[in-house]
Amino acid sequence: MGKQVRVLHVLGTTNLGGAESRIMDLYRHIDREKIQFDFLIHTTKEGFFDREIKQLGGNIYYLPSFRVYNYFAYKKACKAFFASHNEFQMVQGHMTSTASIYLPVAKKAGVPVTIAHARSAGVDKGLKGWITKFLRRNLHRKCDYMFSCSDLAASAVFGEKQYKEGKVVFVPNAVDTKDFAPDEHMREKIRREYGLENSFVIGHVGRFHYAKNHEFILDIFAEVLNQNKKAKLFLLGDGPRRQEMEEKAAELGIKESVIFAGNQNPVAPYYQAMDVFLFPSRFEGMPGTVVEAQAAGLPCLIADTITTQVKVTELVTFLSLAQDAELWAEQLNRIATERKMQKNTETEIDLSKTNYDVNYQVKQYEQFYLTGDVTVMKK
């Protein structure tokens, strides 16, 4: 495939999201003398990772946002882009809502390998969600390979039949586990910085979006606070619903005990300040943040809507979203107490031996990108 393979990653944005963070982890670790990443995104707004991408040698290109009514204009823009760019050996589409449009265009333009990569097990509500499902309905026929971060994401994006027949390659959201290893010095530093020295800290990392269920997080925390006045809720992330959640915290009378810390990069040190990790999402693909929390040695209470594949240690407990906030609060206290009594010192070691660790996974990706042999991703 030539001296340096150029892989084009197609995304919505280059902001601090789950898929974007995982791709950047891979980008930082990959042999960039042999493999270089470029990015095709659907906004001209500057993204969180833009500067780093350019520093690492990548290019950022732009497509118009897809709005259904501009289907033909969108497809025309895709054709124009790939007609003027013949340098890519692979196109990896993480934005699967329109992958059935841009991947066939890329293939017809001469790109040797196209990949559709399922990153989420759900869709937005209403008309937008219906359109996404419609566009994905035959995506499996419009790409060379299908990758997925979990079983649930595979079924949601490519269909149950494709997953059950083993046609979808499982590629978990890997993290650099050594960055998250428990660090007492960093714990003290971050807790001191945010005034958490004597607090019971419940942490969450995620974009303020419908899927993340922040309103339920606040309800759960209100119950915890009734039982423990030293409790604090530590929320990392940003997004369209942040202001709404800040207002809800005020309405619940818990605003003084909730910290909206915004986006943080690197995020790893902030896990050290937490005592327990809360993640009651409505839907997910494979939440890398839960893998990160386990690498940091945190007990995790997560919704049973999330794939069991995310449980890579015994630190994860699942609970139904049908249960009320009071029961979630009780479970948080229980797992945090149990964790204090029995520290699992092997968490980081266990993760580092699997392809949930980016240092392990990058070797698979390098072989795949250089050879086009997808079987190396299945080892």
Name the predicted role of every residue range.
Residues 143-181:
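A short, active-site helix/loop in glycosyltransferases that binds the activated sugar's phosphate group
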Residues 3-5, 9-73, 167, 240-242, ...:
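N-terminal strand-loop element at the rim of the active site
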Residues 263, 282:
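Aromatic "clamp/platform" in nucleotide-sugar-dependent glycosyltransferases that forms part
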